[in-house]
Amino acid sequence: MAPSNTTITLTRALTRDQQARRERLVRAALDLAAEGGYASVTMHDVADRAGVARATVYRYFTSNDHLLSEVSALWIGQVIDELTSRRLPAEPAESLTAMLCRLVQVSAEHRLLTEAILQAATSPDPSAEASHENFQGSLGRILDTALGTPDTPEAQARMADLQHVLGHVLLSGLLGLSHRGRSSEEVQDLMRTAVRLVM
């Protein structure tokens, strides 16, 4: 018997229709966040935009922060796909700098969406933890693309350290961009400095 303070979560695979409905909800939330920021992503408005009953939204997501964590995964995945498909400088530090600066540019171009995703990622809601994990995983993809996949335990440890440090610098820069009125150029300069110092 499980101790009384243990939480057990059961999951089941979604049918094709359920998966399509869930994706439609995430797309609706992404559109609302892009149009009006965090405050625009209410469960009621997401349901209306997706053309489903409000109860349907709660069947898939526990809160708007949970929903925005999925928006984060979708949007950041699309941005990283675009970054990794670009022609990059051959030198690893230059390649890393180019990718991080482009990520800042895209975030500035979609400031309301960036603000919504960051607000969810820094929320105390436990269901939004996936947002932070998505952010770190995306940074890992950037590092792998720019620097190559590490092949020794020492290189893997160094890559983990780089991911941790650059992740904090990037998060701080994006919060400055979306919440404190910093310009895209200021945040790009911050990323250039960070890469120069850690590389």
Residue ranges and their predicted role:
Residues I80, D125-H168, E185-R196:
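Amphipathic alpha-helical packing segments from all-alpha helical-bundle domains
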Residues A98, Q105-R141, P153-E154, L175-G176:
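Short secondary-structure transition hinges
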Residues E70, T84-E109, Q163, Q188:
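Hydrophobic alpha-helical connector segments
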Residues G51-F61:
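Short hydrophobic/aromatic patch on the recognition helix
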Residues L25-A33, V79, L103, L170:
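Short hydrophobic clusters on alpha-helical segments that form packing/core surfaces
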Residues M1-G36, S40-R49, H66-S69, L74:
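Basic, helix-initiating cap at the start of DNA-binding domains
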Residues R21, N64, V71, W75, ...:
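Hydrophobic/aromatic residues within well-ordered alpha-helical segments
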